[in-house]
Amino acid sequence: MFSNRIIRRAALTVAVTAAVLPLAAAGPALAAGSSAHHAPAGVAAAHSTTLGAVQRVDTFYNAYIDAVRVDDFATADKLRAEYLSSAAQADVESWEEANHANGILHAQDVPDGATAVYEETAAGTVYLHVDLKWGSDTSTVLVRYSNVDQVITGISDPS
């Protein structure tokens, strides 16, 4: 029951983002008029890939939070298997053993939500940070995402 809610929420997040992003991208071009310079196709493709990485990480974190909040650990484990590389899964498990907390959230409690924020791209890897919302406070984890394999390859504390 809860996993259907999580899947619907993830699908809704992707659908809304897919509908809004083209409008946001069109705004500056429309404001600049017909003399606007167009980015080369490679730049547009790189931008699209980066947006895909941000969407995927954001979708993962919010679906994972929903699953953990309702103690649906089977769904949480499925999400880990789908969105994390096997090396990242092993690193998360090691972090959990050492810190006695959730290795995805880097916390013992469950936040209210999450927002993935792009930082940079280098050599096929997108570097992001994820802001975890805790009422009026936030905490941050750093995330590495492989554009090649389309999985999270690392989660760490910002230090």
Q: What are these model-derived regions, one by one?
A:
Residues 32, 136-159:
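Short beta-strand edge/turn micro-motifs at domain boundaries
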Residues 28-35, 97-138:
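Surface-exposed, charged secondary-structure patches
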Residues 17-21, 53-56:
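Hydrophobic alpha-helical membrane segments, chiefly transmembrane helices and signal peptide h-regions
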Residues 10-13, 142-144:
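Short amphipathic beta-strand/extended segments with alternating polar/hydrophobic composition
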Residues 1-7, 12, 21-48:
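C-terminal region of N-terminal signal peptides and the immediate post-cleavage residues
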Residues 41-98:
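Core segments of small alpha/beta cavity-forming domains
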